[in-house]
Amino acid sequence: MVIILSFALLCLLSASLAWIDIRHGIIPDWLNLTIAGLGLSKAVILGGPFAGLEAACEGAAIGAIFWLLRRLYFTFRKIQGLGLGDVKFLAAAGIWVGVAGLPMLLLVAALIALACAGVMQLAGRPLHAQSSISFGPYLALGLLFASGFQQYWLCC
């Protein structure tokens, strides 16, 4: 029951995140914190306090890695390649899927973003090297896919 309820809430929060990021180009801190808190609560309820600590450490490590990648990209290119809200979201997502689920999350997000960019290009919207897109909705879909896959895989 906890798994189903937490996943349903994650779906609702992810939809909110996608809508806000598409509309305003930001991912609010309160939303990232809510997703992180829900993931930590789920980990503690299902696995105990040490599972929550492990999930928190994995989320923090993932957030730190992507923050470093963001800084390195800016250092070399002098433009932002990944928003800070995306970095914080990846840290929160890391609590949900851990290091093991991160490749699936990123692959799904990148493939969906690439497909959408291709559709936009075919529809006549010109995309250039400096074009920016809101990556949060794609990360949210990647999180839902990776989390759903992990929960199904572990339950069945």
What do these predicted ranges mean?
Residues 1-156:
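A membrane-topology feature that recognizes alpha-helical transmembrane segments
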